[in-house]
A protein has these predicted regions:
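Secondary-structure transition motif
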Residues: 1-62
């Protein structure tokens, strides 16, 4: 399982899809040359404090 990574410790690769955390908001987005971008809201997230890799989908449930 993915763990939250502080932006002070490490940043994602450019254009890498991530889950981001900002002020009690978890968002799906990516990291670009402009910073963190929210894919669904189509906006910049300037106060992102943590991020994580997109988790793998669940295994097939029987």
């Amino acid at each position: 399982m993915s763990e939250w990574i502080s932006v002070k410790d490490r940043l994602p690769k450019l254009n890498q899809e991530i889950l981001g955390y900002e002020k009690d908001i978890v968002y799906w987005g990516f990291y670009s040359q402009f910073g963190f971008l929210d894919t669904l809201e189509e906006c910049e997230r300037k106060e992102t404090t943590h991020w994580m890799f997109i988790p793998n989908p669940p295994k097939e449930v029987v």
